[in-house]
A protein has these predicted regions:
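Repeated scaffold domains used in trafficking and secretory/extracellular systems
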Residues: 1-10, 48-68, 97-110, 141-154, ...
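Long, internal scaffold/assembly segments composed of regular secondary structure
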Residues: 4-21, 25-41
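Surface-exposed loop/turn elements that mediate protein-protein interactions on large endomembrane-trafficking
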Residues: 1, 28-54, 75-98, 121-141, ...
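Short beta-strand elements that form the blades of beta-propeller/WD-repeat-like
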Residues: 12-25, 62-75, 79-81, 106-121, ...
Length: 209
């Protein structure tokens, strides 16, 4: 098959790769787990192969190790969470089908976030945050034209070049404001309850609500 994306575990011994391949004229996807420390029984170091059958003809465009024993697969049909606690036997622990159009994804060491279209009316977008096992943390609809989407510590950050919107992990809005300079990046501040807003010419730290 053709590799689409790959991710190395933090200690460098495990690798996930998403492949596209042709099967009877249909393009399909498979996820392959490799282990270079313990996978010696297989000359290719393969310890697990998964076909996202339940997600139909999904294409897994992004695969990521969150830490040594948790990984996540993002496809156009949903999210799959895997455990490699037993390094020679990767296990699918949670699968979340997503029917709406997925606009953005983000991930941190212990959280995963997606923004989809909101098909239920009202606000145009829906934000969903999950923990590294795939359990829902919160979901919220919003109406905000963002270009950046990140998770930093216990903050979810949505921002564009002139403003930002910030939620905590209960879905409470902690900040919603504009800036008088061009914004290139927003992150959690140096101290709890603060936000660092960075631009090409300026950097400012603000206090959250």
């Amino acid at each position: 098959g053709y590799p689409v994306d790959l991710s190395l575990s933090p200690n460098g011994t495990q690798l996930i790769t998403s492949y596209m391949y042709l099967d009877q004229g249909m393009i399909k996807c498979k996820i392959v787990f490799y282990n270079f420390g313990l996978g010696k029984n297989d000359p290719n170091r393969v310890v697990g192969i998964f076909f996202p059958k339940d997600l139909g003809d999904a294409m897994a465009g992004r695969v990521r190790f969150l830490d040594e024993s948790h990984s996540v697969i993002f496809s156009d049909k949903g999210i799959q969470f895997f455990s490699t606690r037993v390094e020679t036997s990767p296990e699918l622990v949670s699968q979340i089908p997503i029917e709406e159009n997925i606009r953005s994804i983000t991930y941190a060491q212990d959280k995963v976030g997606i923004v989809t279209d909101n098909v239920e009316g009202g606000d145009p977008y829906k934000l969903r945050i999950y923990d590294r096992e795939g359990s829902p943390v919160f979901e919220k609809t919003f109406n905000y034209q963002y270009t950046g989407f990140d998770i930093d510590g216990d903050l979810v950050l949505l921002y564009n070049d002139s403003s930002c919107k910030v939620y905590n992990m209960t879905g409470t809005e902690k900040y919603n404001g504009t800036f008088d300079f061009t914004v290139s990046k927003v992150s959690a501040g140096r101290f709890p309850g603060t936000l660092l807003v960075m631009g090409p010419q300026k950097m400012t730290e603000i206090k959250l609500q």
